[in-house]
Amino acid sequence: MAILSPRKTALALAVALSCAWQSPAFAHGGEAHMVPMDKTLQDFGADVQWDDYAQMFTLIKDGAYVKVKPGAKTAIVNGKTLELQVPVVMKDGKAWVSDTFINDVFQSGLDQTFQVEKRPHPLNSLSAAEISAAVAIVKAAADFKPNTRFTEISLREPDKKAVWDFALNGTPVNAPRAADVIMLDGKHVIEAVVDLQNKKVLSWTPIKDAHGMVLLDDFASVQNIINASSEFAEVLKKHGIDDPSKVITTPLTVGYFDGKDGLKQDARLLKVVSYLDVGDGNYWAHPIENLVAVVDLEQKKIIKIEEGPTIPVPMAARPYDGRDRVAPKIKPLDIIEPEGKNYTITGDMIHWQNWDFHLRMNSRVGPILSTVTYNDNGKKRQVMYEGSLGGMIVPYGDPDVGWYFKAYLDSGDYGMGTLTSPIVRGKDAPSNAVLLDETIADYTGTPTTIPRAIAIFERYAGPEYKHQEMGKPNVSTERRELVVRWISTVGNYDYIFDWVFHENGTIGIDAGATGIEAVKGVQAKTMHDPSAKEDTRYGTLIDHNIVGTTHQHIYNFRLDLDVDGENNTLVAMDPEVKPNTAGGPRTSTMQINQYTIDSEQKAAQKFDPGTIRLLSNITKENRMGNPVSYQIIPYAGGTHPVATGAKFAPDEWIYHRLSFMDKQLWVTRYHPTERFPEGKYPNRSIHDTGLGQYAKDDESLDNHDDVVWITTGTTHVARAEEWPIMPTEWAHALLKPWNFFDETPTLGEKKE
């Protein structure tokens, strides 16, 4: 039976009952209480579509796909007939349903997508009640101060071996639920560990020399500071702006330049670049160029205004929401699953085909997939303990006053989980997707539900295999994929992350960038203008008076692979041309040079797509005696030029602070506190506290519990086709079984 949210059901019915009426249609021997269909189902979270040709409603909610005609006594739910107690009734041109319609249809038992969790997984996200409890316990501590804000409240993970024992054998984890709490007391970062079961603070640790994340209320603070500044208002007049209320501010981290930017290292600062709202819905198209305000968040004031030559604000309207366009007419494309989903969701566990994995949301890195296993002919085999975005950076290459500091650590500085963008069915994800709400804590410590935070859907992905033998019947089968999709909007850019599970054991990781380019105002209208060459030194002229500045989107994924067990080894296979010594007319042969990469510093390397890198379990073999392995492919194609490394000189501070950018493969020994490639507190960090630090001690990787980190991404050279809104541009990575199985895994089980 489908388990649906009682809170949502109650809300939908409460709203609907306020405008209900009695119908002569009878249910259970009495008059039915009728409520408006559109309002009731939309408040419940379902999509309502009307097919004028078929004279039929289509209702979509998570795992249920319902078709029903007005007046009919039956509905079709996932391809199966369901008798209705009360038909849909049309009155005054509107559809009405009984107040039992939601329960009758969406809890009919025909949709088996959601199952009851009988044994809570030890990695389940903190519930709203647990978040509130953690905050109450922390606030009761003697050292807590009233104006303290919360950066992150998340599950403190139990011991890894105990979690695997639970996932593989069902052994309960003998540890109380606990929370990690990160706070900001003014500019001071504090970490606390809270025992939720025994309601006490286990540790309280001030963190020295750390700048915390930028929190959502910092955005409002900056806007208020700018609006209240008479000094800034005077500077705006140089740019032809007399009304400061039309100015939109974007608070940005200031980076680190060893004092060469004239900023105090211990101050909590943001740099503010601004845009003019001209009423077209796209203020990004109207940059106020060469104007930067430096705001001190503690003093609540502008401490410095940095200026360059005055550039007129580009004023041409550039809406991207379709207000000035005629929408193309396209016929509907319906994706239906008439017999229901091929996957089930039990609590936070997903089961599809032979895959099982746990899914939870983190306010910094978004979805975390855990205890990933593959059922190989009845044996549950370990593949990955945890996989998630580790971190990312978007560095720009322009040295001008409004650009030189721009290197956005989107997850580490802003929290990409917090900035999750609700997914729109039929646009951001296909109509057959299940959309999951997620709960995190806001900066006040209040539990906040993000609606439609994650989409899960199955899709057709071409042929899995095919062979047409001459004169024989065709042999082929379709490829299916299960996709876990999450979208985060960080300022002008929207990032789409897909975890793609293949039936054949492959896991794809796709990162897509869309949204609005960060653009620079310039003098040139066309490339024939006198200033065009200088104006486009660091970018492309993509509109009159607008340059798209060259930058990079660099993603790093933390992948704690446990290939058939926790102890693994990094193996290299390099195809080589070698002389033919076996005789015959050939002078050369293709051979594989295979060797072990046995330490962390040796493992940190550029990715050569002509070579093979494996994480192998040298203690396990397939039936041919080959060690079971997974291939690591940091870059498996994309639609922009690949980022082969950081486009910065080695003497740049950003290069020293964030070395994860420049190598596509890193492998480190497992340590539970090593989670972020940019380090735990990267904002204004003065040296590398991430992967460069993790690999510094050069620990052995040979037959140990190793963690793989892959860096991938693109160098973004702007083009006109990406303006005023950018089509999604993808970078793809893969984890692929390599002698992990004994044969083609999608052939199916052998007949008895």
Curated annotation (Swiss-Prot):
<feature type="binding site">
    <location>
        <position position="553"/>
    </location>
    <ligand>
        <name>Cu cation</name>
    </ligand>
</feature>
<dbReference type="InterPro" id="IPR015800">
    <property type="entry name" value="Cu_amine_oxidase_N2"/>
</dbReference>
<dbReference type="InterPro" id="IPR000269">
    <property type="entry name" value="Cu_amine_oxidase"/>
</dbReference>
<feature type="binding site">
    <location>
        <position position="699"/>
    </location>
    <ligand>
        <name>Ca(2+) 2</name>
    </ligand>
</feature>
<comment type="function">
    <text>Active on tyramine, tryptamine, beta-phenethylamine and dopamine.</text>
</comment>
<keyword id="KW-0732">Signal</keyword>
<feature type="binding site">
    <location>
        <position position="705"/>
    </location>
    <ligand>
        <name>Mn(2+)</name>
    </ligand>
</feature>
<feature type="binding site">
    <location>
        <position position="562"/>
    </location>
    <ligand>
        <name>Ca(2+) 1</name>
    </ligand>
</feature>
<feature type="binding site">
    <location>
        <begin position="408"/>
        <end position="419"/>
    </location>
    <ligand>
        <name>substrate</name>
    </ligand>
</feature>
<dbReference type="InterPro" id="IPR016182">
    <property type="entry name" value="Cu_amine_oxidase_N-reg"/>
</dbReference>
<feature type="binding site">
    <location>
        <position position="716"/>
    </location>
    <ligand>
        <name>Cu cation</name>
    </ligand>
</feature>
<feature type="binding site">
    <location>
        <position position="697"/>
    </location>
    <ligand>
        <name>Ca(2+) 2</name>
    </ligand>
</feature>
<dbReference type="GO" id="GO:0006584">
    <property type="term" value="P:catecholamine metabolic process"/>
</dbReference>
<dbReference type="GO" id="GO:0005507">
    <property type="term" value="F:copper ion binding"/>
</dbReference>
<dbReference type="Pfam" id="PF01179">
    <property type="entry name" value="Cu_amine_oxid"/>
</dbReference>
<feature type="binding site">
    <location>
        <position position="561"/>
    </location>
    <ligand>
        <name>Ca(2+) 1</name>
    </ligand>
</feature>
<feature type="binding site">
    <location>
        <begin position="490"/>
        <end position="495"/>
    </location>
    <ligand>
        <name>substrate</name>
    </ligand>
</feature>
<feature type="binding site">
    <location>
        <position position="551"/>
    </location>
    <ligand>
        <name>Cu cation</name>
    </ligand>
</feature>
<dbReference type="InterPro" id="IPR015802">
    <property type="entry name" value="Cu_amine_oxidase_N3"/>
</dbReference>
<dbReference type="GO" id="GO:0042597">
    <property type="term" value="C:periplasmic space"/>
</dbReference>
<feature type="signal peptide">
    <location>
        <begin position="1"/>
        <end position="27"/>
    </location>
</feature>
<dbReference type="Pfam" id="PF02727">
    <property type="entry name" value="Cu_amine_oxidN2"/>
</dbReference>
<dbReference type="InterPro" id="IPR036460">
    <property type="entry name" value="Cu_amine_oxidase_C_sf"/>
</dbReference>
<keyword id="KW-0186">Copper</keyword>
<protein>
    <recommendedName>
        <fullName>Primary amine oxidase</fullName>
        <ecNumber>1.4.3.21</ecNumber>
    </recommendedName>
</protein>
<dbReference type="GO" id="GO:0008131">
    <property type="term" value="F:primary methylamine oxidase activity"/>
</dbReference>
<dbReference type="InterPro" id="IPR012854">
    <property type="entry name" value="Cu_amine_oxidase-like_N"/>
</dbReference>
<dbReference type="InterPro" id="IPR015798">
    <property type="entry name" value="Cu_amine_oxidase_C"/>
</dbReference>
<feature type="binding site">
    <location>
        <position position="600"/>
    </location>
    <ligand>
        <name>Ca(2+) 2</name>
    </ligand>
</feature>
<comment type="subunit">
    <text>Homodimer.</text>
</comment>
<feature type="binding site">
    <location>
        <position position="562"/>
    </location>
    <ligand>
        <name>Mn(2+)</name>
    </ligand>
</feature>
<feature type="binding site">
    <location>
        <position position="705"/>
    </location>
    <ligand>
        <name>Ca(2+) 1</name>
    </ligand>
</feature>
<feature type="active site" description="Proton acceptor">
    <location>
        <position position="410"/>
    </location>
</feature>
<keyword id="KW-0574">Periplasm</keyword>
<dbReference type="InterPro" id="IPR049948">
    <property type="entry name" value="Cu_Am_ox_TPQ-bd"/>
</dbReference>
<keyword id="KW-0479">Metal-binding</keyword>
<dbReference type="Pfam" id="PF02728">
    <property type="entry name" value="Cu_amine_oxidN3"/>
</dbReference>
<dbReference type="InterPro" id="IPR049947">
    <property type="entry name" value="Cu_Am_Ox_Cu-bd"/>
</dbReference>
<feature type="modified residue" description="2',4',5'-topaquinone">
    <location>
        <position position="493"/>
    </location>
</feature>
<feature type="binding site">
    <location>
        <position position="694"/>
    </location>
    <ligand>
        <name>Ca(2+) 2</name>
    </ligand>
</feature>
<dbReference type="Pfam" id="PF07833">
    <property type="entry name" value="Cu_amine_oxidN1"/>
</dbReference>
<dbReference type="InterPro" id="IPR036582">
    <property type="entry name" value="Mao_N_sf"/>
</dbReference>
